[in-house]
Amino acid sequence: MATREQQPEGRRLKVARIYLRASTDEQNLERQESLVAATRAAGYYVAGIYREKASGARADRPELLRMIADLQPGEVVVAEKIDRISRLPLAEAERLVASIRAKGAKLAVPGVVDLSELAAEANGVAKIVLESVQDMLLKLALQMARDDYEDRRERQRQGVQLAKAAGRYTGRKRDAGMHDRIITLRSGGSSIAKTAKLVGCSPSQVKRVWAAWNAQQQK
């Protein structure tokens, strides 16, 4: 693997950080590996791969924040899909992109702003036009990602209402295995934050499960 020191003198190393969805699905993993390979084939040194469990509709994603903190000037963030970067409302999504650019980094998303387009040599008016088009495409893609997220939530809400009306809705199924792990860890003295991290859920969910279990024990 190339390092900064191994590059020929005078040649600037192109560095990328890749942001992905955490997945165990074989097809998703193959697609992600293809993205990593394509980034390297484009001449980029991959300084980090960040696999996120949290939803793109959240601004406080741990891996996203870690990646932004790691960014150095001149680097490129390569996202698997635009909705991995953000499903936030457009204003919040633009602030997120601005925080990446504030570190002196650029954003590349296949099909929106490709690595080849970022590397394109342009000066003067041509450069301004190219960057303006890239910004417009990125803004449009961010808005479409948010619209898709809201459409999915609305369809889910309508589905729940129809199921309730038909007497078929029973609510979200309990994950017995996850609940058991939470109870075991908390009973062993693990903090709420540590338990949430180990189990892969939110601290609020740990609190709910633990409170429900304690209430059951007191009956």
UniProtKB/Swiss-Prot annotation:
Transmembrane segments: none annotated. Residues 15-159 form the Resolvase/invertase-type recombinase catalytic domain. One of its GO terms (molecular function) is DNA strand exchange activity. Gene3D superfamilies: Resolvase, N-terminal catalytic domain (3.40.50.1390). Keywords: DNA integration, DNA recombination, DNA-binding, Plasmid, Plasmid partition. PROSITE patterns: RECOMBINASES_1, RECOMBINASES_2, RECOMBINASES_3. The keyword Ribosomal protein does not apply. The active site is at 23 (o-(5'-phospho-dna)-serine intermediate). InterPro entries: Recombinase_CS, Resolv_N, Resolvase-like_N_sf, Resolvase_HTH_dom, SSR_resolvase. The keyword Metal-binding does not apply. GO terms for biological process: DNA integration; plasmid partitioning. Involved in plasmid partition. Belongs to the site-specific recombinase resolvase family. This is Resolvase. It comes from Escherichia coli.
